[in-house]
């Protein structure tokens, strides 16, 4: 079994760590300018196995670099069969595209986001690629089954949002706005969609709500083979995540990438 080597930094990943880069972007309103241009003429790209994606937001350029070029979520796909996935916090749907492209047309997936624009963009990618067994949901996760709706906080001038506090260490690009979103019981939603199939890969990026989300689905985690998760340091350290996943039999393998604000960690169920 081979182990992927360390991620290679890209120009984009280096720049995002430099405060002067972010100051210049804000001063020149480069994200807003890029988003205006991309809204008129989105970038369209094709992945190695033929899946297609588009870029309609300036912020998505960094996300595309992380997922498609640096491949921060590649570990669950190395030296193991993968047929099913869950994308929690799908945003514009790039991990959904990455996973389905690696799996092939038979991919079975569930992609969830609480931001209505992001859920719609994820659904566009699903429909555009003809993934008949991948389902998109506009819902928020991490609440008890008896809670039908929950608040969700949007930053209207970019594509971020959270069921908890947005990162206070990064200046917001606009006034935060609260919306009400339907909740979803993920274990039931997965069974309705995929039956008794296990989850080969679960990707989690829920902007600081990681522990709350994981604690609401112990049964589903016990049927999950690998987890790749972004933890957000302004809410929680990684150790509580390790503990919740450990109770489900998922062991911490490594930190894939990390910066002062967040990190990506990989977990797996021991094989054999």
Language-model features, listed with the residues they occupy:
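Phosphate/nucleotide-binding beta-alpha loop and adjacent structural elements of enzyme active sites
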Residues: 1-272
């Amino acid at each position: 079994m081979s182990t992927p080597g360390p991620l290679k930094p890209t120009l984009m990943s280096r720049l995002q760590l430099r405060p002067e880069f972010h100051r210049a972007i804000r001063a020149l309103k480069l994200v807003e300018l890029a988003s205006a241009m991309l809204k008129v003429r989105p970038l369209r790209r094709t992945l190695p196995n033929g899946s297609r994606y588009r870029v309609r937001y300036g912020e998505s350029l960094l996300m595309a670099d992380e997922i498609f070029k640096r491949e921060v979520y590649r570990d669950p796909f190395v030296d193991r069969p993968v047929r099913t996935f869950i994308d929690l916090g799908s945003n514009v749907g790039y991990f959904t595209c990455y996973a389905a492209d690696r799996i092939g047309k038979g991919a079975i997936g569930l992609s969830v986001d609480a931001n209505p624009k992001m859920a719609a963009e994820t659904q566009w990618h699903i429909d555009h690629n003809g993934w008949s067994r991948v389902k998109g949901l506009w819902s928020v996760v991490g609440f008890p089954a008896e809670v039908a709706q929950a608040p969700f906080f949007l930053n209207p001038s970019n594509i971020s949002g959270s069921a908890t506090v947005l990162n206070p260490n990064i200046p917001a690009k606009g006034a935060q706005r609260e919306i009400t979103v339907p909740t979803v019981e993920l274990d039931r939603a997965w069974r309705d969609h995929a039956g008794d199939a296990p989850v080969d890969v679960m990707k989690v990026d829920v902007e600081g709500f990681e522990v709350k989300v994981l604690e609401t689905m112990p049964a589903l985690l016990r049927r999950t083979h690998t987890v790749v998760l972004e933890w957000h340091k302004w809410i929680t350290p990684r150790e509580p995540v390790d503990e919740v996943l450990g109770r489900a039999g998922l062991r911490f393998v490594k930190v894939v990438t990390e910066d002062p604000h967040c990190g990506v960690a990989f977990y797996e169920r021991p094989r054999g």
